[in-house]
């Protein structure tokens, strides 16, 4: 069965721009893959433990030498990495906060970049284990970061995502940028009017 992993990381709940667009993507994906399955992971609805010294020690302990306590400490992280390996495709909603990802998304990434789970060491260097999968990123940003925008050079998020997921082996990446979203939250723009061209951009991916 073809499987899509939908990841949301905005703390804005139903008001989230990125979440509405990942949902639109999932609906269109199911139309294109009627026998497929969408697995939803909302990073803002779970309590992720911090990456502390004990977690790092557990992570770098060989699996056959970990204690029961260490395995329990890594259990949620292993659930995340299993979801990534089990999926054939990803759609990932990422709000831009202070020119980077949301805190929830960054913590999730720290949980999933793991030796033997999503990356392995080879004689020629690290090799990502998520190859052969497509990732579509939906970025929502308050300011405008398009090619001709004044702040275009401050879009650090897209190259960062390309670097990180490329390290994990993902080569097929697509981006939908819903920038200028501050106009919605300040009442300068109607939500439906703002979303319309971005919904069209998502649908165009399936044309």
Swiss-Prot record:
Binding annotation for FMN: 10, 16-18
MF terms in GO: electron transfer activity; FMN binding; oxidoreductase activity, acting on NAD(P)H as acceptor; oxidoreductase activity, acting on NAD(P)H, quinone or similar compound as acceptor
The protein's required cofactors: FMN
Keywords (A to Z) from UniProt: Flavoprotein, FMN, NAD, Oxidoreductase
Domain of life of the organism encoding this protein: Bacteria
Cofactor binding: number and manner: Binds 1 FMN per subunit.
EC number: 1.6.5.-, 1.7.1.17
UniProt key word Signal: no
Catalysed reaction, written as an equation: 2 a quinone + NADH + H(+) = 2 a 1,4-benzosemiquinone + NAD(+); N,N-dimethyl-1,4-phenylenediamine + anthranilate + 2 NAD(+) = 2-(4-dimethylaminophenyl)diazenylbenzoate + 2 NADH + 2 H(+)
SUPFAM superfamilies: Flavoproteins (SSF52218)
HAMAP family: Azoreductase_type1
Role played: Quinone reductase that provides resistance to thiol-specific stress caused by electrophilic quinones.
The family this protein is said to belong to: Belongs to the azoreductase type 1 family.
Quaternary structure, from the entry: Homodimer.
Protein name: FMN-dependent NADH:quinone oxidoreductase 3
UniProt gene name: azoR3
């Amino acid at each position: 069965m073809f499987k899509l992993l939908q990841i949301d990381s905005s703390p804005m709940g139903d008001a989230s721009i990125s979440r509405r667009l990942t949902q639109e993507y999932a609906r269109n994906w199911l139309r294109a893959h009627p026998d497929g399955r969408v697995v939803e992971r909302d990073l803002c609805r779970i309590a992720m433990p911090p990456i502390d010294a004990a977690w790092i020690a557990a992570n770098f302990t060989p699996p056959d030498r970990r204690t029961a306590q260490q395995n329990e400490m890594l259990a949620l992280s292993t659930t995340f990495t299993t979801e990534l390996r089990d999926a054939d495709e990803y759609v990932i909603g990422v709000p831009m906060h202070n020119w980077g990802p949301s805190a929830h998304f960054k913590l999730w990434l720290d949980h999933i970049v793991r030796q033997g789970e999503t990356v392995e060491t080879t004689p020629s260097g690290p090799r990502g284990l998520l190859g052969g999968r497509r990732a579509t990123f939906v970025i929502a940003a308050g300011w405008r970061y398009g090619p001709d925008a004044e702040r275009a050079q401050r879009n650090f998020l897209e190259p960062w995502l390309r670097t990180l997921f490329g390290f994990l082996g993902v080569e097929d990446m697509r981006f939908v940028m819903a920038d200028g979203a501050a106009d919605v939250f300040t009442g300068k723009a109607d939500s439906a009017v703002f979303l319309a061209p971005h919904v069209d951009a998502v649908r165009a991916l399936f044309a």
